[in-house]
Amino acid sequence: VLLLGSGWQNKFCLEDTICAGAIADQLLSSNNFISESDSSVAAKYLYKSARDNYFGYLKASSHRKRLKKLNLNRDIKYCLTPNQTNVVPTREDNYLILSTS
């Protein structure tokens, strides 16, 4: 499994890393996956620091500030709420599609 955050304008995004940390934490706790990379360790630490209050934790992030200026606080809160959908995209022939299984 490769987790790749999209970032913003070719730059690191804190919320992408926290999301990757949440996914990595779930996968690794299943004991079906292993990781020996420092990036997954760092992402998991960020996730565990933020998981009790994503909205507050990301208050200083550049992306949240940008979206707040666009009056999108409600959207931000929705995006920071885990397990909002059961749809999982998959990659097929260089396209993202909805999983059929």
What does each model-found stretch correspond to?
Residues L3-G7:
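Short, structured patches in soluble enzyme cores that scaffold and shape functional sites
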Residues Q9-K11:
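Short gly/pro/ser/thr-enriched loop/turn and capping motifs at secondary-structure boundaries
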Residues L14-S101:
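Long, charged alpha-helical interface segments
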